[in-house]
Amino acid sequence: MLPPAESSTPDVTSVIPEGGLSTADLVVIVLYLAAMMGMGLAIARKQKSTDDFFLGGRSLPAWAVGISIFASLLSTITYLGMPGEMFRTGVAFLTRQLPIPLVLVVVWGLWIPFFMRLDLTSAYEYLDRRFNYAVRALAAIFCLLLLFGWISVVVLTAAGALVDIAHLDIGWFLGTNDPSTGYRDADMHLVIAAVGMFSILYTTLGGIRAVVWTDVIQFLVLMVGALFTMGYIAYDTGSGLGDWVSHSLATKHEEVEWFSLDVGNRSTVFTISIGMFFWFICTHGANQVALQRYFTVRNVREARISYLVSALASLGIGVILAGVGVSLAYYIQDHPLDASIARNQSTASLKQLDDTLEAARNNDGQQAAETIAADQSAQRRELRKTLNKAQDSIFPQFIRHYMPPVLRGLVVAALFAAAMSTIDSGANSTSTILTVDFFRPLSRTQATEAGELARARYLTAAMGVVVVLYTLGLYHLSKGTNIIDLCQRGFNCFLGPLGATFMLGMFSRKVASTHMVLAFVLGEIVGVSASYSMEFFGAPFSTHLIVPAAWATTMITALGLLLVIPQRPSPEQLRWTRRAVLADEHLDSPAAAQPTAGPSEPAAD
């Protein structure tokens, strides 16, 4: 085994400014958090029913809902993950924006007109009408797993950034700090609990109306934070966008091919594009967080405006965060960071391993090279873990060491904003699913409006405890994993079958409940297996292909089962295909959209 290569980067750790949060930074952060809590309290006083708590009375402004859709799906995952990916692949990572025009056609033209005619609170009510309660409950359970994983990754990334920036050293005080891990376990445990519980406390107060309006403010804060980051770098270095892009193009990044038949190839233009396409259409067609936003506006026209606003915001922030990534890459040339030094050393060591492998292939033949590659595999995995963690830590360490006070506090507030916009949305949606898909249909007696509203708030608080525990486990499981990869492994493995289930319900007149349950379960097995293919099979699988692979498995299995299971949907269930829904003039009335069967009386197949 080769020793780590010596980096060409000199030992400059002694000149890295100490940094950390100043009193002025803390004042900015506290004022921001107090404002969010105050808004939640103010809106909570006006809520009288679960319709207000879950849907805002279906009367929220379309533009605000659009910003909320985007802000909820952005989170610290993208806010920190995209700059980290820019270090890894350079401007090639912008190919993730390529499928957005095609996604616009699907969501604008197919999904929104359909869902807005159904008068839903939970998206999974539709599956009860089209299939039966078993399919509805199964999909709702896996959406809850998706949301738990999603919120947990958000809390984890926010906590990691805060530990990097604040330099708490709680572990040193308790005697449990392990300097070799990079992350301090005691620090992370405390911050995970604090971030998660504060966000859930704020969310239990104001419901979806508070979520939407605080998302608007949080969107503005995170935009200002990103723009100020680039502005400060431009001012401090006397550089501009042209300098940053030129430097990025001249830097050797991980190569991104256009296409590859190797499913273990992490990123190609094709896999990034196809992965983002399926992620978008499945999220906007099956994820309660996105669909619940559309249900808060009055009609199809306003829902389309909401989606258009979110799509434009996605394109805009994608470019801005790419700008943050390339500007940081330019800045750290002359401004050292622990993370950038670790990145350079890991990159140099990986290059040395590549050179050794290539020399063996040229001098001793392919068989000798394969033997050396097998010997190098463990060392390569460790180096890539170090590299991944270093790339995701550059932005937080830059904030800590080089940003001036007040501006540093504003950017930290933006990190909180990105986390809170996802946490509040996810918590409200989990409470919606538990109330609408489980408590209502399974309860023997109907709760009063006041009782159901109180229960919704209790459920939201309980979800906070679950999320904190889930996040603590995920933290120890995922050390050394890149944030973008962590998204796929932590929760996106559940998304593909959810999207396929809704699409089969909409477009197939033959797929029935038994086909759907079996196909859904197999699709989820494939999604989880693909996410953890290295652990299960000892071979990598591209994280960008996890959602498409699970989606395709579910679709093909359901259609294939038509040949062996003769069950067919009933006439009542066929009323809920997309064509029938759009043609049914009676669906304009909410009463006409109520399900005809519950869990105790399954719809006839």
Regions found by a protein language model. Name each.
Residues 2-605:
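Membrane-embedded helix-loop-helix hairpins and adjacent transmembrane boundary segments
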